[in-house]
From Swiss-Prot:
One of its GO terms (cellular component) is cytoplasm. Residues 9-30, 159-173, 421-441 have a biased composition (Low complexity). Residues 216-339 form the OTU domain. It comes from the Eukaryota. Mostly expressed in stems flowers and siliques, and, to a lower extent, in leaves, roots and seedlings. The gene is OTU6. Residues 73-86 have a biased composition (Acidic residues). This is OVARIAN TUMOR DOMAIN-containing deubiquitinating enzyme 6.
Amino acid sequence: MTRILVQRGSSGSSSNSSRPSSSSSSSSGSETQINNNIPVPPVTIDEEITDEKQEEVTVVEKAECSDAKDVAVDSDEPADREDDEGLVVAENVHVQSEGIDCDSPVSGGSNSDSPPVPAPPPKPSSTVNPGSNRSVLGSFGALRIGPTRRAAGPRSLVSSRSSPTGSHPSSPRSHSENEGYNSSDEHMPCYVPSHPGSGLEREHQFEAEIRYSKGFEIRRMLEDGNCLFRAVADQVYGDSEAYDLARQMCMDYMEQERDHFSQFITEGFTSYLKRKRRDKVYGNNVEIQALAEMYNRPIHIYSYSTEPINIFQGNYSTDTPPIRLSYHHGNHYNSLVDPHRLTVGAGLGFSSLSGRHVDKEQVKAAIKAQQEHQIDNALLAEGRFYSDLELTEKEIERSVMEASRAEYLMEWSKPRIGPKESSTSNAETSSSGARPSGSDSKPAEAVKEKTVLSSSIEMVLSMGFSYAQAMEAYSIFGDDVDSMVCYVLETSCGGNNRRKGKATE
């Protein structure tokens, strides 16, 4: 769509362009004459342009009219703006319409049906030059520059209000308003070394020195702004994820001791506590002192040295091990752990008591339990000793009895041969002599049996033992019936011989 606007009241022509006093009117007249003489060719793009594009072109033309005013303001002669404003607006709209029509001869399009466009006359430098406006807005690409720059203006004003130092999001005010602001490290870039000598080599050297001299291990904390509370939670609770609990308890303690800690805060104490309760807000020396008093444990700070550079004491004297932290890069804390002496849980819940009286009852109970355990172990060991001794004695007694039995059997087998020989010799002698009567021999045999079978042997036999066992026991113990019975019971082979009668009782 091509729109041609004609400036009313312009009486000049292209022949009057040589006048320096009326250059603006002559230029508008020349443009009007050119547009009146040149026939407008058929526009083929209008057939393809939709209603939305037509509305867009109209809106752009309106926007460029205002841009033309802006260009007029930026000129070197602001006094001529009111006189030439109408001319400038008309010229800009005319040029923009030419820029939109791709086949327009004024915009430099090649058309065989249209005559060549004559060059415009030169303009004097003393007046407002509308050609400069055309050079800016004479093309379709330049047509989009005006609104874009105008829209970017307010955004640049808003962004200029941001903090020039790139402060932490948790900072309450900008850097220019931080007079008396305690947490100045919150405005520093996160985890940037504050001195050129710090780096990986220095970190490794410090870690090696502290391990060699003190035996401490550096347990690294997450670098998220909660490093101080993470390190303290790792030392006290054994879990760095309990950092929020340590933070809130620290703020509660500082609020409880407002009269003391407010002396070290140069800003509003309530706003300070409110900000420090937020996540990822740095902790400083004030919070470290509060943590030392709250847990009643001294806090030792190590920073690239084997000795603490700062020590924070609690309220009371205590013998609990200190909380050891390592300070890196001027804004990060890690936990220093002694692997041979764990200090997790020391001082929990007893911040108002001395450390040497904290676990008095528990120590007594532990000592008593240890003593009872030692007594039980001693009794058990004694029982084992006596049981072993008894078994040893029984084994010795058994071996002695077996040895004596073997000896008896050897001796008992020899006397049985002797009486037979004596009986045969007696028989030979008696056969030669007078033979006694049979009545005399029978009582002699009965007496012999009575003398051999004593009362102890008979008692053993009555208990169900064999004659050989009774005779063996009798040969060893004599008439001691109890010893004979015990011996027979011991020498009986397990379940081979049944224990009968009074022996089982």
